[in-house]
Amino acid sequence: MNVEEVQRRLWDDSKAQRQHRESSTPLFPTSPHDGRARNVMDLMHNPTWLTTAALRVMKRSRNKAPGVDGVKVRDFQKGFEDKIEQLRLELKRGTYQPQSLRRVMIPKANGKMRPLGIPCLCDKIVQEAIRMALEPMFEAEFHNNSYGFRPNRSTHHAIFRCQQLMRSKFTWVIEGDVKACFDEISHKAILKVVREKVLDNKFMDLINRFLKAGVQVDGVVQPTEKGVPQGGVISPLLANAVLNKLDWFLHDQGMHGKVRARGYLAGRPDARFARYADDWCVFITRGSKRYAEGLREKIRDFLRTTCGLELSVEKTHVTHVRDGFDFLGFRLIMDTGRSGTNVPKILLGKKAIPNLKERLEDALRRRPHQESVALRVQRASAVVRGWSEYYRIAHDFPRRAGTLDHHAFWIAVKAICRKLDITTAQAVKRYGTRGRIRVGDSCELTRFSGIPMKLDYCGPEDYEPGQSATATDSELEVSFSRYNEKKRPGNMDLKHRVLERDQYCCQQCGCEVDDQDSQMDHIQPVNCFASYARASYFENLQTLCFSCHWSKHYAR
């Protein structure tokens, strides 16, 4: 069996169902009335399908905590084929029973605790097999403005979607959050959306068993009558499938096609949205605050009746874009540019820097006392790189880099003082070099000022069946470059011509650059021309590095 080919057919059939037509070559015998897939349970006990799921889970879970049975990846690798065969037979006979989840509490940013449910390794494998079958079906149905826990999509895509809507003269925004989405989501709603895609009672019974498996707290198993475990393999997909109903409800609140053109002429309100998991924003144009508040009540009623969920009162607000709003850790606000035009800005959220300080202190302090300073600095550097990779799309990231370096330097100095029992002056003299923390010749604390802001961006690529997980940042970078080369060949060719003319050197500082770390700068400002296209002619472009480009435009 070719797993990717099967997923491709599942995706094609589901897409055909959405378009209200029958697939020409369906994988499973389907009813001519609804096009739902049958005999999906046969995939669950197929040796190739189950082995593929096991290998994916073992690769991701190598260093993860075990479930209630205590079995780790290295334990499962011993007699791997026999264990897979036993698991396959249990699924085929219908005797497989998921074990309860191990409950772990982790702190949230607001000081509360978030419950995580850790399944055992065998349950993860079966859940992965379920996900491999369901994901292609649901991806054909998911709305394009949903970005959470989906292949080739990330929080950055959602943020840039919001920026795009702000640029399109959407003035009011409803910033919303679903209250305890994973904990309160209705099992009935989950089974209903799965049943819309699958006509297989055995498969539905398997999903129901996972939903009712329960959680183990202090050795006592507590039943689960609602919600999906945060930590389960299929939990994000099932939650997305239910919230997809909300996406299409919000889609229907806006105007599209010819209706949108007529609505624009008539001055009627229009709405657009972006959603990442249970966080979402609805943007409204040509509408008043009262209209936005009325739409918020419609959303509240829809969630309550269709999904069995409630809006979080303390996190759902109606805000004007000029006042700014928080979304996914960023602060988005409409600012006024130097030429008097409206410019949507992406800024660091108010919790971003305190969160960074806490993580740095934890990386430098919460370890065995005998651990060396070099190892602690390496771990802190990983925190700096990870935090910067997420927040470097913010417009104020370059401006705050020096302040962040200052914070990181003194947090590291204080941690070194505690470990070595020396004074601050001694720590700075031994490890501080021109505002840098350096241990030996090869270990240095990564500096924020050396990380460029992320400028190049384009939308997420279409879903391709066979993708196994949400894309990593490196994979997203590759997809961005493919998108540029494929859909913007003229721009890429012009960039290469400018780079060759400038001999791949920054025209301000003289450093060497390449395709990835170079920027095209307009010698004469764009506002001196009638359009952006007229400003972007060959003679008006020059090569600059990231630092020089942003110093030119934002260091004033």
Please report, for each region that a protein language model flagged, where it lies by residue.
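Non-catalytic, polymerase-adjacent accessory regions of viral genome-replication enzymes
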Residues: 1-82
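Conserved polymerase palm-domain catalytic core
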Residues: 90-94, 98-100, 104, 109, ...
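A conserved non-catalytic segment of reverse transcriptases
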Residues: 212, 218, 306-372, 378, ...
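Right-hand nucleic-acid polymerase module
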Residues: 354-423
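Extended C-terminal regions of large enzymes
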Residues: 404-411, 416-485
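Short Cys/His-rich Zn2+-coordinating modules
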Residues: 483-494, 523-531
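Short cysteine-rich loop/turn motifs with clustered Cys
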Residues: 490-519, 543-547
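Histidine-centered nuclease catalytic patch
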Residues: 510-543, 556
